[in-house]
Amino acid sequence: KRLKSNFHMQIKRVVVTGLGALTPIGNNIQEYWSGLVNGVSGAAPITYFDATKFKTRFACELKNFNVTDFIDRKEARKMDRFTQYAMVATDEAIADSGLNSEDHNPDRIGVIWGSGIGGLETFQNEVLNFAAGDGSPRFNPFFIPKMIADIAPGQISIKHGFRGPNFATVSACASSSNAIIDSLNYIRLGQADAIVTGGSEAAVTIAGMGGFNAMHALSTRNDSPETASRPFDKDREGFVLGEGAGALILEEYEHAKARGAKIYAEVIGGGMSSDAHHITAPHPEGLGAKNVMLNCLRDAGIKPEDVDAINMHGTSTPLGDIAESKAILDVFGNHAYNININSTKSMTGHLLGAAGAIEAIASILAINNSEVPPTINHFTDDDQIDNKLNFTFNKAQKREVNIAISN
């Protein structure tokens, strides 16, 4: 027999009430937006380690960042860099939102955080230390707690006293986008009043650079790092690795309105998909990208022609950019030519598990400022990409943005 239920669900509206960013082109929201609209490249020679023998000797590192300006030195030593970045970005977002556990029910505030790799530097250093020793298993007691991806949302909740849903999403470059969608749905279904969400990554390490070089995924344009990330350009030849964090406060609309919160935007839908094709290469016709955008539009209850701007995944890889641009034409048809399309990875590099968060923030800021950041470093059209599409090449464009998608 089927069980009867008196449960009637009312889907709640979800808004963004706080933002925080720590990126290669700015260490807070104001600096990040300035870097975006001014077309600043975050790429430069690697300073974290001697990269002389690496195929790629540059990356998008953070600039002028000292963790002890934000976190006590003793506490910082217990955290991998990806967690440190998460703490800094979420502190900014929480302060921006005015949300706290003293004035609001902490059992109804959660943390859902994305990271594609987690504590890679911690893992790398512990293994290197072991390999250099006599075989005795001398490991730091913080090795595992520093390394696991779920430690970032754990540390955030401990600091701020948030006792709602708490977990990490690990889905490679989609990690923080998935975290945002999970947060959206938890609030929609009434399981939380607010959720701190986003993602962080700190993979500019010996292991990170070496591993991605072995995959032939990275640009090797060592003579001109600042022009290496060039999405949709004919001469693109790989992505540029970045690092940092992006944080958003998602909140139930009535809860935000009741406390007089500043509202940046409403999150009206999210889509997820897999192309079930290959471990690294995209489906040649962009099937995964096509399905995820269709799912997003369906979930949001809007039509393709309602969309004004799309911040593409746009990694500057030979196959990926072609596949994603095909998907946009398939989904949006002739309306695709009316949309401002861009890739902020041309400036920030690819932040892996944090990419979705900082790019969602860029889309939100585009709505608030009526300006779409550029896709920099375009020099030569690629005849395999429809260049009648407006990729917002090289210079930001002013326009009204009511609905934006972040891929």
Residue ranges and their predicted role:
Residues 139-144, 164-171, 233-237, 339-350, ...:
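Short pre-catalytic strand/loop immediately N-terminal to key active-site residues, enriched for Gly-Thr
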Residues 86-99, 152-153, 157-160, 165-201, ...:
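Active-site-proximal alpha-helical scaffold in enzymes
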Residues 16, 31-33, 37-171, 200-209, ...:
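Conserved beta-ketoacyl condensing-enzyme motif
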